[in-house]
């Protein structure tokens, strides 16, 4: 590994600190910048694959841009990127390669990692997934009673759930008619109960997604769904109540995304129907691996290939574009600018597409699990803030909920606005094109956040002087606008890859390992220790802290 560089000790960091101090003087800075440069929007608008990205409404000058790019150079971001693409073990704490980019490389490529051709391995699994997807979609794959599959349930959690459900929701217009996917992740029994309540076990296929086939939540839910399906088949008289009949039903109604073939077989799944992935694929980077099997079934192999092509297009851009035209690099550096120099603690992602309603939740795991770290990859403490809280809702819902805070709150909240030019459902309200009305809000919000409203402009509207201050908008609230022609599988792949690489850039600058997630381990271990106390074991209860003892005792007293 290269020597760790402390970003705060670089010349570029000092330059940026000085630029921030000067830039912060005076209100309505973006108004002045646009007035001074009629070509600002054109100069700060970049294209990456099918994405049209307007960065001009950010708190940015050419001098700041150059200093940010110099910071990237001094932190050797491109060298670290190349190491990732080459399969070097940049996941230091787990001594692993980080190769989600290999999941979408061309079949003709080669990439040897730890003695294996990763690209060949990927396409071997993809071919298997596509053959399976075609069988389900065509009706060739049938349940134990001979009926074709109508519902696919994906049982997973974290990256094995958030990515597939987000992508399925985003691409619903591309889903095969008569086929539905549902997703069970929460160990709360309500999740599985509600998701299966109206389903027919005879036409339901279950995908259990767990690399090790040991994830507590996933295996608990998998066993519950197995019991629901088998008991339902028996109750309907579809199968006899024998062990052999139940085993036959599991073999027809369950497949796995896992590499633990012994555990898969023990569950009752034929290992032939297990789709593998690798230690160099992190969960939050795995939607385009076998974890996306449910999506491949839903949108078909061609749709999934287009999805992968979108990822690859942005991978190529990130690898080859000049720094000043490199969109993921630039956006990652802007996030550093706001987090570390503007004291921004959160980042809003505001898709003006209802189909992207799960995209902010997906980005929460991608960004916060990756960069929510207080220790650098060499074990030393970080020297500056890291990570942001990512959040958001689709427009225009958010406008009537939390935009107030973004417009007039006391903290800078950078926001990414995402929209498509062509809707899936063109609709007219009388003579009004509803999508155009919808996107008018998209355009208006970024303008309002950037340019605000002065006290004189408020007074010119005849506003009572007493409430003028409350109706002033300071402006200078930074936004990035991302647009595409339509929300296709390829465009969705591009969006995901864009944010993957943004997250990577930030992690390199902060000197952290963006590809481990030790923060999720402690709570999981403690839950196993506390479980006996919850179930009534007083000795186990006595080992807990007083607060936990009190909470568990209250629960035991009130549980019926």
Curated annotation (Swiss-Prot):
**Any one cellular component term from GO for this entry?**
cytosol
Q: Name one GO biological process term.
A: gluconeogenesis
Q: Name one Pfam family in it.
A: PGI
Reaction equations catalysed: alpha-D-glucose 6-phosphate = beta-D-fructose 6-phosphate
| Superkingdom of this protein's organism | Bacteria
Q: Where in the cell is it found?
A: Cytoplasm
Could you tell me the keywords of this UniProt record?
A: Cytoplasm, Gluconeogenesis, Glycolysis, Isomerase
Q: Does the UniProt entry include the keyword Isomerase? A: yes
Tell whether Cytoplasm is among the UniProt keywords.
yes
Cite the active-site annotation: 369 (proton donor), 400, 524
- Stated EC number for the protein is 5.3.1.9
What is an example of a GO molecular function annotated in this UniProt entry?
glucose-6-phosphate isomerase activity
Catalytic class of the enzyme: isomerase
Q: Pathway, according to UniProt?
A: Carbohydrate biosynthesis; gluconeogenesis; Carbohydrate degradation; glycolysis; D-glyceraldehyde 3-phosphate and glycerone phosphate from D-glucose: step 2/4
Give the main location: cytoplasm
**What PANTHER family does this protein map onto?**
GLUCOSE-6-PHOSPHATE ISOMERASE (PTHR11469:SF1)
Q: What does this protein do?
A: Catalyzes the reversible isomerization of glucose-6-phosphate to fructose-6-phosphate.
- Which family is this sequence assigned to? Belongs to the GPI family.
- This chain belongs to the protein called Glucose-6-phosphate isomerase
């Amino acid at each position: 590994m290269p020597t760790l560089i402390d970003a705060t000790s670089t010349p570029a960091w000092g330059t940026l600190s000085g630029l921030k101090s000067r830039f912060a003087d005076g209100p309505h800075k973006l108004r002045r910048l646009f007035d001074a440069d009629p070509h600002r929007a054109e100069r700060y608008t970049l294209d990456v694959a099918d994405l049209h990205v307007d960065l001009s409404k950010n708190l940015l000058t050419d001098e700041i841009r150059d200093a940010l790019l110099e910071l990237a150079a001094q932190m050797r971001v491109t060298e670290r990127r190349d190491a990732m693409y080459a399969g070097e073990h940049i996941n230091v704490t787990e001594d692993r390669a980080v190769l989600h980019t290999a999941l979408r490389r061309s079949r003709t490529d080669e990439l040897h990692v730890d003695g294996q051709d990763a690209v060949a391995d990927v396409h071997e699994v993809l071919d298997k997934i596509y053959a399976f997807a075609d069988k389900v979609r065509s009706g060739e794959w049938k349940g134990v009673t001979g009926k074709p599959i109508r519902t696919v349930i994906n049982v997973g959690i974290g990256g094995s759930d958030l990515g597939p459900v987000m992508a399925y929701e985003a691409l619903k217009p591309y889903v095969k008619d008569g086929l539905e996917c549902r997703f069970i992740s929460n160990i709360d029994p309500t999740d599985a109960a509600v998701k299966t309540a109206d389903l027919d076990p005879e036409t339901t296929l279950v995908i259990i997604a767990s690399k090790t086939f040991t994830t507590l939540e996933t295996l608990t839910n998998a066993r519950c769904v197995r019991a629901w399906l088998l008991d339902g088949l028996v109750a309907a008289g579809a199968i006899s109540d024998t062990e052999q009949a139940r085993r036959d039903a599991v073999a027809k109604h369950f497949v796995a995304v896992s590499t633990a073939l012994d555990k898969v077989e023990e569950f009752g799944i034929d290992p032939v129907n297990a789709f593998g992935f690798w230690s160099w694929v992190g969960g939050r980077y795995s939607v385009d691996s076998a974890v996306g099997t449910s999506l491949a079934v839903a949108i078909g192999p061609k749709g999934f290939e287009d999805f992968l092509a979108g990822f690859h297009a942005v991978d190529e851009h990130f690898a080859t574009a000049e720094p000043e035209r490199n969109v993921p690099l630039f956006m990652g550096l802007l996030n550093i600018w706001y987090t570390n120099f503007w004291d921004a603690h959160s980042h809003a992602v505001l898709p003006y597409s209802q189909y992207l309603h799960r995209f902010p939740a997906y980005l929460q795991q991608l960004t916060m699990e990756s960069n929510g770290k207080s220790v650098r990859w060499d074990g030393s403490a970080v020297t500056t803030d890291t990570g942001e809280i990512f959040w958001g809702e689709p427009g225009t819902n958010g406008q009537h909920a939390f935009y107030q805070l973004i417009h007039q709150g006391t903290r800078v909240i950078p926001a990414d606005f995402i929209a498509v030019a062509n809707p899936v459902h063109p609709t007219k309200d009388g003579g009004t094109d509803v999508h155009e009305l919808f996107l008018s809000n998209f355009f208006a919000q970024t303008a309002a956040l950037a340019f605000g409203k002065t006290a004189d402009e408020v007074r010119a509207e005849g506003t009572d002087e007493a409430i003028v201050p409350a109706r002033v908008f300071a402006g200078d609230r930074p936004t990035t606008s991302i647009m595409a022609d339509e929300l296709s599988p390829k465009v969705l792949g591009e969006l995901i890859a864009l944010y993957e690489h943004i997250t990577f850039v930030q992690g390199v600058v902060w000197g952290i390992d963006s590809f481990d997630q030790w923060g999720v381990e402690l709570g999981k271990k403690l839950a196993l220790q506390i479980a006996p106390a919850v179930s009534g074991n007083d000795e186990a209860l006595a080992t807990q802290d007083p607060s936990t003892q009190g909470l568990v005792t209250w629960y035991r007293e009130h549980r019926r």
